[in-house]
Amino acid sequence: EIIEKSGVSSSRFQNIFRAKDGVLTELVQFMFENQFSMARSAASVKLPPVYVYAVETAIQMTLTELNENLREIYLEAYTQKEACEYIQKETAKELYQIFGSYQPELTERDFYELEIGSAGIMRGYMAHPCDAELTLEKKLRLFFTMSLRAYNVPEEEIGRVIRFVEGLDIRTISEQ
């Protein structure tokens, strides 16, 4: 489908991206860059960085609920070695900036190791489609509670972050 819409031959496409894994990694890089900028816009510069994290992860999870093709891409990205490594390394840099003040004794490497776990939580929720009991809103609350506790965010602030995201039209933001 990508080859067809791009208007190039499959051999030229392969030369550009080397392989399916190269295409996935390029796509992941593009999506990663755009999601954090969208999240920064939605969270506003006046709010603490933890809100940017919450909006960014909410966008990812919401996208997988709105589009099965995107669910497959995200799941593959969190599974395929090169793409997953890119996600974890780049996310660790963001996490260090966002959560470093909550755990000043931790290094960027420590946040990389924490990201391995939080990425697993994210992938788990992405892999399980919402249903009548596990709604998107419930998924987001559970994810924020688990991940923000791992980053040592105080309980009161976790509650404020959850209420903030619940006040957003995350589906509309995700579709932009």
Language-model region placement:
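Hydrophobic alpha-helical connector segments
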Residues: 26, 37-72, 79-80, 88-92
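Contiguous, function-dense segments enriched for cysteine-driven chemistry
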Residues: 32, 36
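C-terminal peripheral helix-coil segments that are non-catalytic and often amphipathic
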Residues: 97-101, 131-176
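Amphipathic alpha-helical packing segments from all-alpha helical-bundle domains
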Residues: 76-130, 134, 138-145
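Helix-turn-helix
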Residues: 1-22, 26
